[in-house]
């Protein structure tokens, strides 16, 4: 068969043969096979052209995708899959991109961890979860995480939380909230305990008593609809104690209002 026409169509070229076959190819494909109008090609050559064109097109797509930010193997695979490329072609593209160091899951993890150390507040468990969602192997993640000291990150996150909640919660409630928030961010309980033990959490006593009075007033309005006398006092005490207020402060206030 003969190539009847090669016509540029935006980023691709339309190749038509005199037997009715047609396909889109990249410029790299034309150069690789030295294709030209009137050139004789066999069915086997046409199949090779199709395979190379898919590979070249897919690789260009992948490089475009990677140009915006670093990507993992899985991210590139999923992106190419959306463009209806064959699995065998996608695997070849990824293998070549790995060989050329365009894709490197190890470096991706290291970059992710560096960014978290500089600007982030995530603990190892949350980081592991996020990286596994990106298709990175557990072995790569565990090795990289084991080399990071997460104490400074947890401490920085803790100080930020203290600054945010210090004037809104009593000391015990602040400590409890701090513990829960840090665990939710993926830090281990032992590390959170160590951070809490080394931080000096100071709360203004006058402010704490003001918060206690406001909370007591709120709880009293609610509980007085169902309880009275000793039962009301007990329920109110329990409600305030659960909120993290000091038992002596609660008893003192209850003596004034009940």
UniProtKB/Swiss-Prot annotation:
Primary location: cytoplasm
Keyword Protein biosynthesis: no
A GO CC annotation given for this chain: cytoplasm
Highest rank taxon of the organism: Bacteria
Record keywords, A-Z: Cytoplasm
InterPro entries (UniProt xref): RecX_HTH_1st (IPR053926), RecX_HTH_2nd (IPR053924), RecX_HTH_3rd (IPR053925), Regulatory_RecX (IPR003783), WH-like_DNA-bd_sf (IPR036388)
Location of this chain's protein in the cell: Cytoplasm
UniProt-listed Pfam families: RecX_HTH1, RecX_HTH2, RecX_HTH3
GO biological process: regulation of DNA repair
The UniProt record lists the keyword Secreted: no
Record family assignment: Belongs to the RecX family.
Protein name, entry field: Regulatory protein RecX
